């Protein structure tokens, strides 16, 4: 996994903060990684999603465990006519392990979201908290002025900041 794993550094501070002050280290995968490598990274790092970066660390996608699970759980469908009315029947005779093995060698960009919402270090965390809440995201990649990944901001990062503000810890 060493060739397809990227890591950037982040910091954490309390007070009236911007994203840059509370962002955390980001794990990412390269755009040319396969889903087997991505799944391994998700499990080994204990994360549920990863920004996908190009060779210059620009964010080009975002992949989550949910994207992979949807692909594994996808059902094949066929239409059947019953008395003149179309009825959709679901069938899936392919075992789960076979589906997972078939996904293993597919490119991450086949499942990754390509329109990625990102934060910048200068943004106030209140604005990003609102965005995370509204979009129901768990985290956002943090990018520099050139679109390169420099960290992530998570809901838990914001909650730690709020806790520190409330309790002075």
Descriptions of predicted regions:
Residues 1-169:
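Tandem CBS (Cystathionine beta-synthase) repeat/Bateman regulatory domains
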